[in-house]
Amino acid sequence: MNGPVDGLCDHSLSEEGAFMFTSESVGEGHPDKICDQISDAVLDAHLKQDPNAKVACETVCKTGMVLLCGEITSMAMIDYQRVVRDTIKHIGYDDSAKGFDFKTCNVLVALEQQSPDIAQCVHLDRNEEDVGAGDQGLMFGYATDETEECMPLTIVLAHKLNTRMADLRRSGVLPWLRPDSKTQVTVQYVQDNGAVIPVRVHTIVISVQHNEDITLEAMREALKEQVIKAVVPAKYLDEDTIYHLQPSGRFVIGGPQGDAGVTGRKIIVDTYGGWGAHGGGAFSGKDYTKVDRSAAYAARWVAKSLVKAGLCRRVLVQVSYAIGVAEPLSISIFTYGTSKKTERDELLEVVNKNFDLRPGVIVRDLDLKKPIYQKTACYGHFGRSEFPWEVPKKLVF
């Protein structure tokens, strides 16, 4: 069932314009994702009591320990111990036999007030629409017509494999599963005048933490039959698809016991799986004044709206900001040759006419003061219809 362990496999692509692309995802119990979820749980806890809270919360985890650190200015009174432990419990680390236990882990808190230097230049004595960017930076939004979600198939499938394993674990169907998991999907594509069309799944990799009582053969069989076949459309699988299921052979030690975790280390998993581009700023634990998050959400909103309006089949949108300045410094659009309109003039005019990308307007248009962020912290921030930035705007052009 599993592919060759010596790395030898057929990488030939007979069709002109064909290429392969790979994306990965991680599950809720991956140590970096634990930290993302805790940071966003802290953000949500503040927003529930104080929608104007200024939050920059980082998390570190290792065996038996969680550290919260960062800067928060808020009217809320938060029980950080409870927020952290409830999050770990929800993820599924509820027994020391799993290597991490919400009941017994040590929670350290090193949170300070937001720097007054930042506050005075970003939001103090300003109307909300004129709130400045919380820092300089560049952010990207990407969309492609290859899936209904306007997301790359590679990352869509990688996320769905992890989601499926979590569902089977929580329902008790596969009781040997534990929370830490990683997936990776390679898809063969063909190019079509700048757009990309998925043809087949070339390779699937799944590594998931498990208990001691399950055999390798039984795990591989269950992962193929109950995870992969339930998630990946049959039209993309064929007799040449390669599977690397539990390729290490054993994954009992996982979560923070296996690796240290830190907020913001899965930025490609969080976005487009390597497609498009990334400005480097992470999302989790940050309120809307941090344009790393809010402007990246807005750029995705712009990109998806352009594709859904039929103005292009594939697009990358870049925006940039300076600290304390509300208006973006630049807006750039790249359509890979898939639009009949010019990028610099016509499409940019459409964007400027339909979108106001100041942080104080983004927060209003996308309702970013609501405590919605813990849900975003696993399985990707994009391509999920429950989030406002995934609802295309009806464009006037």
Swiss-Prot record:
GO terms for molecular function: ADP binding; amino acid binding; ATP binding; identical protein binding; magnesium ion binding; methionine adenosyltransferase activity. S-nitrosylation of Cys-121 inactivates the enzyme. Binds 2 magnesium ions per subunit. The magnesium ions interact primarily with the substrate. GO terms for cellular component: cytosol; methionine adenosyltransferase complex; nuclear matrix. Changing K182G: Loss of S-adenosylmethionine synthase activity, but does not abolish polyphosphatase activity. It catalyses: L-methionine + ATP + H2O = S-adenosyl-L-methionine + phosphate + diphosphate. Its EC number is 2.5.1.6. Keywords: ATP-binding, Disulfide bond, Magnesium, Metal-binding, Nucleotide-binding, One-carbon metabolism, Potassium, S-nitrosylation, Transferase. One of its GO terms (biological process) is protein homotetramerization. Pfam families: S-AdoMet_synt_C (PF02773), S-AdoMet_synt_M (PF02772), S-AdoMet_synt_N (PF00438). Pathway: Amino-acid biosynthesis; S-adenosyl-L-methionine biosynthesis; S-adenosyl-L-methionine from L-methionine: step 1/1. The keyword Transmembrane does not apply. Its cofactor is Mg(2+); K(+). It comes from the Eukaryota. PROSITE patterns: ADOMET_SYNTHASE_1 (PS00376), ADOMET_SYNTHASE_2 (PS00377). ATP binds at H30, D180, S181, K182, S248, G249, R250, F251, D259, R265, K266, A282, K286, K290. Mg(2+) binds at E24. Changing F251 to D/G: Loss of S-adenosylmethionine synthase activity, but does not abolish polyphosphatase activity. Detected in liver (at protein level). Expressed in liver. L-methionine binds at E71, Q114, D259, K290. Belongs to the AdoMet synthase family. Catalyzes the formation of S-adenosylmethionine from methionine and ATP. The reaction comprises two steps that are both catalyzed by the same enzyme: formation of S-adenosylmethionine (AdoMet) and triphosphate, and subsequent hydrolysis of the triphosphate. This is S-adenosylmethionine synthase isoform type-1. The lineage of its organism: Eukaryota, Metazoa, Chordata, Craniata, Vertebrata.
